[in-house]
């Protein structure tokens, strides 16, 4: 069996809560997952000081557990890159957009982590204000994401190189399932993305962004996909929901997702669980 602790939206900066971050760290030590997956929004305002704190937190976890992390929309310098996106200097715009993430976290926006029993392919969906993320609503500018062909190709390559018996997991930032409280999808191309991930053999999608914990099963390309949406570790909770993270457990027969919710003074404790049969022919 492989265990993946899935957290999201840490939002280092004013929304970060030290006691919750400490409890998350304690849970990682106690649960001893094979991997920790952080699906973006490490910072609140993409500030250098916030990235420094986020990096220190990730390094602390990495001393004992492998970590895979991707950027979220709050980690992108999207506002300052608007003019650059409209210019001919596309490469310069790209480098500016992710410059602080590259400096403090990683040069890789689509990282891959393989552990015994699973491969986690990061797929960047946080592109700031870009053509693929545009919708008809002004409020979506810089907030909504999309799955690009380039990033999808990297997922395909990661799965092709992975062990045949490894569970295929994709990690994105933006939620492909409409939030119960927000009523919004996080992706501009949700349907296409889900079909593409299913066609590549993915069994599980990890995401965040919506600040609302959720677990869904969807049918795409004649295959079932499980979507684990982690809540936020910060105080930027939605509609009175509790801060939370998800623990994923995958064995030969089942894929289980347990939500751990914040309780004061106990810390993060199990609150609900979901179980799904594995895709036919899959092993872990």
Task: Describe the predicted segments one by one.
Residues 2-11, 117-133, 169-171, 225-232:
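Active-site-proximal beta-strand elements of phosphoester/diester hydrolases
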Residues 1-64, 144, 150, 157:
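N-terminal active-site segment of His-dependent metallophosphoesterases
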Residues 249-284:
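A short C-terminal boundary segment appended to hydrolase-like catalytic domains
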Residues 130-146, 153, 161-204, 210:
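Active-site-proximal segments of metal-dependent phosphoesterases and phosphodiesterases across multiple
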Residues 13-16, 44-49, 53, 73-81, ...:
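Active-site environment of divalent metal-dependent phosphoester hydrolases
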Residues 182-253:
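Conserved beta-sheet core of the metallophosphoesterase superfamily
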Residues 53-157, 162, 196-198, 221-223, ...:
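Extended active-site neighborhood of metal-dependent phosphoesterases/phosphodiesterases
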Residues 7-8, 36-41, 66-73, 169-173, ...:
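Active-site neighborhood of phospho(di)ester-bond hydrolases with catalytic His/Asp-centered motifs
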